[in-house]
UniProtKB/Swiss-Prot annotation:
Belongs to the complex I subunit 4 family. InterPro entries: NADH_UbQ_OxRdtase, ND/Mrp_TM. The keyword Transmembrane helix applies. GO terms for molecular function: NADH dehydrogenase (ubiquinone) activity; ubiquinone binding. It comes from the Eukaryota. It catalyses: a ubiquinone + NADH + 5 H(+)(in) = a ubiquinol + NAD(+) + 4 H(+)(out). One of its GO terms (biological process) is electron transport coupled proton transport. Core subunit of the mitochondrial membrane respiratory chain NADH dehydrogenase (Complex I) that is believed to belong to the minimal assembly required for catalysis. Complex I functions in the transfer of electrons from NADH to the respiratory chain. The immediate electron acceptor for the enzyme is believed to be ubiquinone. It is a multi-pass membrane protein. It is an enzyme of class 7 (translocase). Keywords: Electron transport, Membrane, Mitochondrion, NAD, Respiratory chain, Translocase, Transmembrane, Transmembrane helix, Transport, Ubiquinone. The keyword Transmembrane applies. This is NADH-ubiquinone oxidoreductase chain 4.
Length: 221
């Protein structure tokens, strides 16, 4: 069934990527932005899984794992840290966090890099392999699906730049609010380490998947 409906899934996945990306570009709510970006990334590993190639399936699983690390960290940043301190989720009310929360800004930056699929993160490995699998099956839709890389970089850079930089800190924050607590720091650091560690050395994940994925492809063919 996955072979018979592959191209339908491809079309649905590409439409989802484009629609979610444009929706993300227009939102000003930080949690909505992260949620819409999650939909776009989910569509990427959907079409990677339906590419019925070893690279595509391995990449989709790796991207799903990476997405779990990065999105969890970003939601903690948005809801567990920023919202708790300001009681607002609107990006337009944030600016200058680097001045009063430098440690948070660094951890948030690394997670933002992961969300945009920057090299040396597990997200890059997953996206590259997923899209490579799509290119092998249908190059035209592979090109359209690759626009997710451009869009994710655009809305992630906008979000980070608007929140962390942008002049003096917002009136919604006080200068003495303090940086991240020890609990918040440990939670974010775990996600950052996993994202970067497996981005630099993804072999434990990919080698562990290779036999099962190869067996699956062999049975399908």
């Amino acid at each position: 069934a996955s072979i018979n409906y592959t191209y339908i899934i491809y079309v649905i996945g590409v439409i989802t990527i484009l629609y979610a990306s444009f929706s993300t570009l227009r939102t000003i709510d930080i949690k909505e932005l992260i949620a819409y970006s999650s939909v776009s990334h989910a569509a990427v590993y959907l079409i990677g899984a339906f590419s019925n190639t070893i690279q595509g399936i391995e990449g989709s699983i790796a991207l799903g794992l990476a997405h779990g690390f990065v999105s969890s960290g970003l939601f903690i940043c948005a809801g567990g840290i920023l919202y708790d301190r300001s009681s607002t989720r609107l990006i337009t009310y944030y600016r200058g966090m680097a001045q009063i929360m430098p440690i948070f800004s660094v951890l948030f930056f690394i997670l933002a890099l992961g969300n945009s699929g920057t090299p040396l993160t597990l997200n890059f490995i997953g996206e590259f392999m997923s899209l490579y699998g799509v290119f092998e099956r249908m190059p035209i839709l592979g090109v359209l699906a690759s626009t997710s890389i451009v869009f994710s970089a655009a809305y992630t850079i906008f979000m980070y730049n608007r929140i962390v930089f942008g002049g003096s800190y917002s009136i919604y924050f006080r200068e003495n609010i303090g940086d991240v607590t020890r609990r918040e720091f440990i939670m974010l650091l775990v996600f950052v380490i996993l994202t970067v560690l497996f981005g630099i050395y993804p072999a434990p994940i990919l080698d562990g998947l290779h036999y099962s994925v190869s067996y699956l492809i062999y049975n399908i063919n």
